[in-house]
């Protein structure tokens, strides 16, 4: 992967947390091209399948929207079965020549499950119910794990505080935070 492509994939932070039967997924709003900020309030989350599933993306916007559209089609085809839809999307992503070139990652949550669909078509289900993608993901992930283990904050509050921490550290992440809940 070339340096410019890495910047496209890594230039945001998306974080999802499941706690006490509720899930929250949020992102910052910064859109960058290379080292230039183009927009401060980009929406990188989307509700899917009758509002029961929340997905967020990191990567090239057009590629991510294409993948989200395909994922939504898979959800409809498999009656909202998250894991089956994710595996089928990943299979298509790996085998379809057009999709294989898309540069994006998806983070997906329901009230019970959290998944990451990687740019290589892998489906990853974290053990702790926390999904994080993008350039500030490791900062947000570390903060979320600590807050989940040592506080009684809600999923939404954990996402908000963790994204604020990531925004303080990562130059590709800002503090214009949008959070969705299920």
Curated annotation (Swiss-Prot):
Keyword Hydrolase tagged: yes
PROSITE patterns found in the cross-reference section: PROTEASOME_BETA_2
InterPro entries, sorted: ATP-dep_Prtase_HsIV_su, Ntn_hydrolases_N, Proteasome_sua/b, Proteasome_suB-type
Activity control note: Allosterically activated by HslU binding.
UniProt keyword annotation of Zinc present: no
Top-level taxon of the source organism: Bacteria
An annotated GO BP: proteolysis involved in protein catabolic process
Main location: cytoplasm
Catalysis performed (reactions): ATP-dependent cleavage of peptide bonds with broad specificity
Function: Protease subunit of a proteasome-like degradation complex believed to be a general protein degrading machinery.
Subunit note: A double ring-shaped homohexamer of HslV is capped on each side by a ring-shaped HslU homohexamer. The assembly of the HslU/HslV complex is dependent on binding of ATP.
PANTHER family: ATP-DEPENDENT PROTEASE SUBUNIT HSLV, METALLOPROTEASE TLDD
Designated name of the protein: ATP-dependent protease subunit HslV
Gene: hslV
